[in-house]
Amino acid sequence: MTDTQNRVAMGYIKGVFGIKGWLKIAANTEYSDSLLDYPEWHLAKDGKTVSVTLEAGKVVNGELQVKFEGIDDRDSAFSLRGYTIEIPREAFAPTEEDEYYWADLVGMTVVNKDDTVLGKVSNLMETGANDVLMIDGEHGQILIPFVSQYIETVDTGSKTITADWGLDY
């Protein structure tokens, strides 16, 4: 089993569908059906982890529905409601150069060109035009567009992002 520190939360089980063990999924991914690319899921809740194998999946009216092996009735499916879906980070597809998964950016330290620590990436958000880093630090929350105009380097080894961003912006 993969160490829990190497797993990324990808969504959660929000409910059941029908009587044959199908589940409704709230995916935290750009495309909800991309979760179907991973045959093995880890489900976590209240310190408990369950490993499951994906048997089938489909998108119905924009909603992801899945069926796990061994979950064959509504009661069994209902017992999984509220579990977080975790996928091992090493199962992700490789990224292109200068392309990053949000999960890899969260937690990175952001510094500006003057080596002033702006804080750590707490989250990202989509704006339609580009993604935006949400940085929490001693200077409060800072929002920096994740575009080459402001982001100079992303060093995944040292977990540091260098930004062309002043404290007075």
From Swiss-Prot:
UniProt record, GO biological process: ribosomal small subunit biogenesis; rRNA processing
Taxonomic superkingdom: Bacteria
Annotated SUPFAM superfamilies: PRC-barrel domain, Translation proteins
Single GO molecular function: ribosome binding
Descriptive protein name: Ribosome maturation factor RimM
Cell compartments where the protein resides: Cytoplasm
Subunit structure: Binds ribosomal protein uS19.
Alphabetized Pfam families for the sequence: PRC_RimM, RimM
InterPro entries: PRC_barrel-like_sf, PRC_RimM, RimM, RimM_N, RimM_N_sf, Transl_B-barrel_sf
Family: Belongs to the RimM family.
Domains (record comment): The PRC barrel domain binds ribosomal protein uS19.
Its biological purpose: An accessory protein needed during the final step in the assembly of 30S ribosomal subunit, possibly for assembly of the head region. Essential for efficient processing of 16S rRNA. May be needed both before and after RbfA during the maturation of 16S rRNA. It has affinity for free ribosomal 30S subunits but not for 70S ribosomes.
Chief place where the protein resides: cytoplasm
GO cellular component: cytoplasm; ribosome
Domain PRC barrel per the UniProt entry, residue ranges: 97-169
Naturally occurring in which organism (per UniProt): Neisseria gonorrhoeae (strain ATCC 700825 / FA 1090)
NCBIfam families from the UniProt entry: 16S_RimM
